[in-house]
Every structure is written in C-alpha cells, then in structure tokens.
C-alpha cells in the first residue's frame, strides 16, 4: 500500500476527495493508482449548487483554478468576479460513462430527504414527509438518508417503522479523513435499481437520477436549514428557475435535458484532456 506523502495530503483541497470524486476521475483518466489519486491542481466543485461552484464559506486561495460542472456555473462564477474557471463536468457523469447500464427499468422509488451536515442541521417534520411519500409513490420505497440523519436513531426509526427500506451511501469524508471512495458507485447502483427518484428539495441526487435514466420529482415540505445562505436565492429560486422538476409527476425528456446541462454531461473531456485540466501527468504523481 502506497501512503500519501505530506505534500499530497496537504496541498490538495480536502473537498476534492468528497464522495470519491478524485478517485472516479483518476480511474477515468487511467491513472496508475486510482485508489491514491494525484493532487488536483485547483478546487473541484463537490456538489450541485446554484452559486459559483464553491460551497458557502469554503476556504479558497484567491487565483486558484476553480473546476466546475457546467457552463452555467462558470457564467455565475464569472459574474461574481472569479476568473480561471474551467468546466470539467460532474464526476458522477464520468462514472455513468464508465458504468454501462443494463436493460432493467427499475422498481419502486428511492427517496432522498433534505439533509444537514456537520455545520448545519435541518428542521422539519419527517413523519409528514413519510406520509406524503407513502400516499404518492407506488411500489416499494427506499429511503436513502444522508450520513448525518442516518446516525440519528430517532429519525432512522421513523423511516423503518414506515416500512421503507432504509440505506445510506456512506460518509462523504472531511479534512482528508474517512472518505467512502465508493459513495457514488453505490449511489448509481441504487438509482438504477429504482424506477423513480424523489426528494423534498432539488439536489444532486435528483440530477443524478435523471442522468441515470430514471424519472424524478421534487415535492413535499422543503424543510429549513440552520443559518441558510440566501446569497444566490435559496429554495425560492430553486422552485422558480427549475419549476419543471417540481410536482408529483414530471416530464422525463425535459428534466433529463436539464440534468445533462447541470452536470455538464455533454461537455465531458476525454482522459488525456482531463488529465491536463486536473494538472496530472500520465505517470501519476507530480
């Protein structure tokens, strides 16, 4: 096992490892040790957002390259005065390219409740959401809780008592520790296992489900996030700008087209080009 050097551990932004993103890109690029990705030269957008690609409050070295998922995010980033912004596409989109789908249409629904994290918690009525999902969805329901809520026994038991299959894709990692490099691998497998993906907020999982060829819908109480940053419009803007995804039934073709744009699925780089964009040499470690 090759241990990371101090330079590799400290010089790359820790968020580049979130959800196994760096590992997926290393695999796509054909790097010699994808389990130990080289240092990405820049900050890689680690989740879908309606801002400039950076999570609010993210420590960021001015002038560093910002590697974003879509042309739309790049335009917003430029509008905020950022430069050196490069569209690379979402790591999940590269994973889909590397993982051929079967012919199975999937069964039932996978539900992603809005979640909190180490720095912010969510307030809302999970039982109310459960009742709405049960009244709307047909077939078996899987509730996929984020690690934050999965560790809350009281919340997890609500979904278990409702008869839902309750799962968690793993821990996204934090400060270079405990990254589940197969997080998105497990998520893609679960999305393809189901016919529909739903959530009470528009989020990465909805876009991922659509890219994986699944129907998607956003409905229910969006809940409230502690000290939510409303700089870019928050939940009201989500509903206003992407109204096509809201409601119990949506048009797949329209929503799938939107998902491809948000994830940069039509702008993915080839392995050699992506290596150059990430600052990787073919040999692997620089």
Regions found by a protein language model. Give the residues of each.
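Active-site and donor-binding regions of nucleotide-sugar-utilizing enzymes
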Residues: 1-96, 206
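Short active-site oxyanion
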Residues: 60-66, 140-141, 193-197
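Conserved catalytic-core segment of nucleotide-activated headgroup transferases in glycan assembly
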Residues: 94-160
């Amino acid at each position: 096992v090759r241990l990371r050097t101090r330079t590799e551990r400290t010089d790359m932004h820790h968020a580049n490892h979130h959800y196994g993103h760096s590992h997926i890109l290393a695999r796509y690029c054909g790097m010699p040790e994808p389990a130990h990705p080289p240092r990405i030269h820049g900050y890689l957008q680690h989740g879908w957002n309606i801002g400039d690609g950076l999570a609010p409050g993210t420590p960021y070295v001015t002038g560093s390259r910002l590697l974003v998922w879509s042309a739309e995010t790049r335009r917003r980033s430029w509008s905020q005065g950022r430069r050196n912004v490069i569209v690379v596409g979402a790591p999940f989109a590269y994973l889909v390219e590397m993982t051929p789908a079967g012919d199975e249409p999937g069964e039932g629904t996978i539900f992603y409740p809005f979640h909190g994290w180490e720095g912010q918690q969510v307030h809302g009525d999970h039982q109310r959401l459960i009742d709405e999902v049960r009244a709307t969805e047909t077939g078996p329901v899987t509730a996929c809780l984020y690690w934050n809520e999965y560790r809350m026994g009281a919340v997890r038991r609500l979904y278990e008592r409702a008869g839902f299959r309750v799962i968690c894709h793993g821990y996204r990692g934090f400060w270079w520790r405990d990254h589940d490099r197969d997080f998105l691998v497990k998520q893609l497998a679960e999305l393809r296992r189901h016919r529909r993906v739903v959530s009470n907020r528009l989020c990465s999982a909805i876009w991922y489900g659509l890219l994986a060829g699944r129907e998607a819908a956003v409905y229910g109480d969006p809940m409230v996030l502690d000290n939510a940053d409303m700089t870019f419009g928050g939940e009201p803007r989500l509903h206003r700008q992407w109204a096509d995804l809201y409601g119990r039934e949506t048009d797949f073709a329209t929503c799938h087209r939107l998902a491809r744009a948000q994830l940069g699925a039509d702008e993915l780089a080839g392995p050699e080009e992506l290596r150059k964009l990430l600052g990787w040499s073919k040999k692997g470690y620089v």
